[in-house]
């Protein structure tokens, strides 16, 4: 019985680190609830699919400049968020990179929309997979 209690406690503590995995439709609905126009949802869901497989807790491998990419949209810590190791960042989204790794994607969505407004869709290297005809998200609503 003690083992079972310890196991349940360990799993409960580990659960936040596991992150959330969205589906295309659950991400589209969540982003729409956060104010993203329906007309942009096919592009955003495509980017999330190719950047993180819809997972919120992904930290990408180290880039050639020593930076990393965080969260469902793989937002770069050199320009957009402050890494926890104190490394220099322009931190244009004014948040910690850890805030991009939570199940609550509001920070990720706000920051990603800022990136898009400043740099366009091509800020994401995976845009090449998303710039053509995409499946409708109408079946998600």
From Swiss-Prot:
Pfam families xref list: Lys
GO molecular function annotations of the record: lysozyme activity
Task performed by this protein: May not function as a self-defense protein, but as a digestive enzyme, probably in the gut of the insect body. Inactive towards Micrococcus luteus. Active toward glycol chitin.
Entry keyword annotation includes Transmembrane: no
Family: Belongs to the glycosyl hydrolase 22 family.
Field pH dependence: Active at acidic pHs. Inactive above pH 7.
The enzyme's E.C. designation: 3.2.1.17
Keyword Transport: no
Taxonomic placement: Eukaryota, Metazoa, Ecdysozoa, Arthropoda, Hexapoda
Positions bearing carbohydrate: 65, 104
Stored PROSITE patterns: GLYCOSYL_HYDROL_F22_1, GLYCOSYL_HYDROL_F22_2
Keywords: Disulfide bond, Glycoprotein, Glycosidase, Hydrolase, Signal
Disulfide bonds: 25-140, 46-130, 81-97, 93-111
Name of protein: Lysozyme 1
Signal peptide: 1-19
Catalytic residues identified in the record: 51, 69
C-type lysozyme domain sequence ranges: 20-141
Family annotation (CDD domains): LYZ_C_invert (cd16899)
